């Protein structure tokens, strides 16, 4: 299919047979594919950067991911002590609130732990896992509002109450 694509403010505005407007930049994509940017909703690290290490690493991830076609992403934390998780979330929040000029957008954070069943923890650190409580969650998330996703084990005591709490706060479980 041959078509022109007009991009305004980083978003596709029109597709069809278009006339070039004054001052518009034109790029020839003949023989190429023009696709929307990808969204990665579960990524811990990229190109040597790890979201658990804070803002500088999240910025490196953002800038590197955009070059691969990822337009937006949800940095994913792993099991860690509460203060480490909070530090990681503060870094994610900083990049979400003040995005890189040439980077993939940070849509929020995905907390993959600590509310997991030790039996099914995968690569998560067992000593950092705990039961799902509002107190534990707020201890890790104080000062941030960037959490958008939470992986938690529904079989744990308190899990269903935690799911209701998270849903009320706009967090997908």
Provide a role label for each language-model segment.
Residues 44, 59-88, 104-117, 144-155, ...:
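Divalent metal-dependent hydrolysis catalytic cores, especially in the metallo-beta-lactamase
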Residues 1, 44-56, 122-130:
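Active-site mouth loops of central-metabolism enzymes
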Residues 10, 31, 42, 65, ...:
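Divalent metal-coordination and catalytic microenvironments
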Residues 1-35:
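Histidine-rich, glycine-flanked metal-binding segment
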Residues 95, 130-173:
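Histidine/acidic residue-rich metal-binding segments in metalloenzymes
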Residues 85-88, 119-125, 162-163:
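Short acidic, glycine/serine/threonine-rich loops at helix termini
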Residues 51, 83-94:
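Metal-dependent catalytic neighborhoods of phosphoester/phosphodiester hydrolases
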